[in-house]
Amino acid sequence: MRRIVLDMQCTLFADAISQALVVNDPDFEPIRAETPEETVRLCRSSFAYALIMEVTGYHTPWNLEERLALGKQVKAAVLSCKIVLLVDEKADESLASQVRQAKKDGLIDNFIYASVSPAYLSAVIDTL
């Protein structure tokens, strides 16, 4: 089993992503962090394969700067954990551009747009 920690603002969104991951790859075991403060602990205790974090342009602790800092903490705790940011490219094109740049700069392992299909989401996570 590959454990994937989900750190999302919206519970409904996190549940949908959880279901999409399991349906498309039964080897995935999603675990939801209830708060960003819980994320590092969950990644460490579960030996997470990946951390998927929602990024928003307007709220802390879900803004890009705080997500990058949290990703750095997770990498320090679990070096092999892949950091993936999930961004709504239609709601905030500027934020999506900043997330793409974070990938180019090597600050994250990958990013996913909120508009992708569940199968594509699972395929991206599978190939990290």
Walk through the language-model features, giving the residues of each.
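Non-catalytic signal-transmission and effector/linker regions of two-component phosphorelay proteins
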Residues: 1-18, 116-128
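Two-component/phosphorelay signaling modules centered on CheY-like receiver
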Residues: 11-33
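Short, aromatic/basic amphipathic alpha-helical patches
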Residues: 17-21, 69-70, 95-104
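Acidic, metal-coordinating helix/loop segments flanking the phosphotransfer/catalytic sites
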Residues: 34-50, 60
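Conserved phosphotransfer cores of two-component systems
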Residues: 44-46, 73-80
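Two-component signal transduction core modules
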Residues: 51, 83, 110-111
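Conserved phosphotransfer microenvironments
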Residues: 51-76, 90, 94-98
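Output/docking surface of receiver
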Residues: 87-128
